[in-house]
Amino acid sequence: MSSLTNPNIFTVSRLNSEVRLLLENQLGIVWLVGEISNFSAPVSGHWYFTLKDSMAQVKCAMFRGNNRLVSFKPTNGNQVLVKARLSLYEPRGDYQLIIESMQPEGDGRLQQQFDALKMKLASEGLFAQSSKQAIPEHPKCVGIITSKTGAALYDILDVLKRRDPSLPVVIYPTLVQGEEAAIQIAQAIGRANSRNECDVLIVGRGGGSLEDLWCFNNEIVARTIAASQIPIISAVGHEIDVTIADFVADLRAPTPSAAAELVSRDNSHKDQALISREQKLRAAWRHYLTEQNRTIVSLSHRLEKQHPRYRLMRQTQQADELQIRLQRAMEKYLAQREQKVSRVQHKLQLLSPVRQISEQKNALARVEQKMMDAMDRKLLRLRHQIAIAAEKLDTVSPLATLKRGYSITQSESGEVITRQSQIKTGDTLVTRLSDGEIRSTVN
């Protein structure tokens, strides 16, 4: 049965496509903490790397449009927090993450906790404008919940003294930083509600890092603020600092000094109602913008999943992979060629005429030396043989006989006289001795 006519039989490409859509549509956005390894940044500007922990790892891709927003350059070994979409790289069937944002793990964990608590409390309606209490237009007594030694307290008191010196103030001192701060802040709010001596509370502190302000992002503090029967103005840090307490409070002031202005009548008779309404309008507008932004983000994610850019991204990733494979292949090819050239050079050195001539000269020198040694040995043997022969000849030589006292008589012509019949009267004879000769005449 053909796979083209039976819908229950998948091709590999169709299976990978279905799995990719399933991952992207069902799981959506995930937050992930891990260590970067195998980091690569090709000329395309995209980033490819692996996120791992002690037990597992997953491949990741972060495209140029997103990674240019990262405030640091990742390196192998970095611990990071990433926001990602699950996907599948269809050509290889590799499950991977498409990274949308990245930050160092320390700040990232706090931000992740912040976002999670914000979403949780928002879903319960703690941020809803309908649940917020109105700030009294002309408070009769103001409660301040902050550190008794912090600059925020003195800023608030200075503003109140300048604007409305007759306004009564009750200070509820508490820690505003550290592990015990959240409990103490919640207890101070509860104490102010129990005593019920103020008709508005300012809860806050001066500026600081995310860690310094973290007690105002605590769920206990948030729920205590929401449960307060006395209206609360949050005044945490500077205008750019935003905490969970700001969302839960009945009104948010950008600074402690601004909070003091909101609860005091200006000597120049500023319209406090207008300021309060402006603050409420700002809060409502921020809430509206937050909701609209969440809707836009959701719609953009849905739109992006159908956008041709994703196809282009996948093709770009495939092109980057091919580029990396080509580069590795070229490096391997060049290494093999270098090895081959090295072997050929070695062979050429072995076949070099200069080398051969040198070896032949050395061989001839060895042969010449062997011949000289052989000739010397031959001459030595011949001399020895001649000496032996000379000794033998010497033993039978007439001269040796003469040395023993004998003599040889010859005629004048050199004929040896061995018989008397060989001579006659008047012949001249020569007698040879060992040391000379004697001439005589026969009578």
Swiss-Prot record:
InterPro entries: Exonuc_VII_L (IPR003753), Exonuc_VII_lsu_C (IPR020579), OB-fold_nuc-bd_dom (IPR025824). The keyword Nuclease applies. GO terms for molecular function: exodeoxyribonuclease VII activity; nucleic acid binding. GO terms for cellular component: cytoplasm; exodeoxyribonuclease VII complex. It comes from the Bacteria. It is found in: Cytoplasm. GO terms for biological process: DNA catabolic process. Keywords: Cytoplasm, Exonuclease, Hydrolase, Nuclease. Its EC number is 3.1.11.6. It catalyses: Exonucleolytic cleavage in either 5'- to 3'- or 3'- to 5'-direction to yield nucleoside 5'-phosphates. Its main location: cytoplasm. Bidirectionally degrades single-stranded DNA into large acid-insoluble oligonucleotides, which are then degraded further into small acid-soluble oligonucleotides. Heterooligomer composed of large and small subunits. Belongs to the XseA family. This is Exodeoxyribonuclease 7 large subunit. It comes from Vibrio vulnificus (strain YJ016).
